[in-house]
């Protein structure tokens, strides 16, 4: 009787073991299979992150005496950064840039394109999507060169079209230029995501709303937006993080003129590389990572609260 009970008790354990090892590899061989991926993650993600955190606690510089004898300064770099008016100016400019070119610009423009093209014939829609996607897939360095040629004060295409020779758009309106530039570059992602989301909206619901007398705006507000709410949140989160971390505007304005386009990524680069303060730049990078985490957690909290 006792042996029967023992055998019965052991059966579930063996079943659980088989369920946990469906491939029959065993823990050692399974670990060997994932070892290359874990090694790559450790080398290119984990180690640089830990090294950056360490550098942020030191006075490491690229040149000078501190380059040969690095001191441990603890949170000194962080305190110096938080007391630096240039940091807060850069952060305010970054928030404005993200709000105008990302949250509002790319999201609204992407949704408008997706909404307006949903009834267009197949070939025309494919052509429009290809044109919009071209701005997204072309490398940022190439796009920046094209925009510099467009806005050049001497022989620029825009000045030629508007008959305004000598107009220095990059100097007179630098923030507006990088906002429009970022909208132009990133709208394709929002358009594709919203196009996919709109295709999932049941046509019967829109038809019922139309027959009930709902206007186009009412259909959008009461039927479409509640249905694609999750896609809207995902798009806004992705666009916010990408725009917050983008470095491409530097290729247009180099943060100028007079720090007027010095967003956080540019500020970190100027501090760490041309400025030679690698420890301070690492501390800024950690602060930027913390801000990204706060943004992501805030969006996740909003998403859970609306379920």
Residue ranges and their predicted role:
Residues 1-25:
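Short, Lys/Arg-rich, polar N-terminal cytosolic tail immediately upstream
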Residues 26-307:
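A structural signal for multi-pass alpha-helical bundles of membrane permease subunits
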């Amino acid at each position: 009787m006792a042996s029967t009970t023992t055998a019965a008790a052991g059966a579930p354990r063996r079943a659980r073991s088989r369920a946990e090892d469906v491939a029959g590899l065993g823990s050692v061989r399974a670990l060997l299979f994932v070892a290359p991926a874990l090694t790559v993650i450790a080398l290119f993600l984990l180690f640089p992150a830990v090294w950056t955190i360490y550098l942020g606690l030191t006075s490491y510089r690229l040149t000078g005496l501190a380059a040969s004898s690095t001191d441990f300064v603890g949170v000194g770099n962080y305190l110096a950064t938080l007391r630096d008016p240039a940091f807060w100016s850069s952060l305010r400019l970054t928030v404005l840039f993200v709000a105008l070119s990302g949250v509002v610009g790319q999201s609204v423009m992407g949704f408008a394109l997706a909404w307006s093209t949903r009834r267009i014939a197949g070939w025309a829609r494919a052509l429009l999507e290809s044109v919009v996607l071209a701005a997204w897939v072309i490398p940022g360095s190439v796009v920046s060169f094209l925009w510099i040629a467009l806005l050049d004060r001497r022989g620029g295409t825009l000045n030629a079209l508007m008959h305004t020779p000598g107009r220095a758009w990059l100097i007179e309106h630098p923030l507006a230029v990088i906002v429009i530039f970022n909208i132009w570059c990133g709208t394709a992602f929002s358009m594709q995501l919203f196009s996919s989301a709109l295709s999932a909206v049941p046509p019967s619901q829109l038809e019922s709303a139309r027959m009930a007398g709902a206007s186009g705006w009412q259909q959008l507000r009461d039927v479409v937006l509640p249905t694609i709410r999750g896609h809207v949140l995902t798009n806004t989160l992705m666009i916010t993080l990408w725009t917050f971390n983008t470095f491409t505007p530097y290729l247009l304005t180099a943060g100028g003129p007079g720090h007027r386009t010095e967003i956080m990524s540019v500020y970190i680069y100027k501090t760490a590389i041309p400025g030679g303060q690698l420890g301070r730049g690492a501390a800024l990078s950690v602060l930027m990572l913390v801000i990204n985490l706060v943004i992501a957690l805030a969006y996740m909290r909003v998403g859970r609260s609306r379920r």
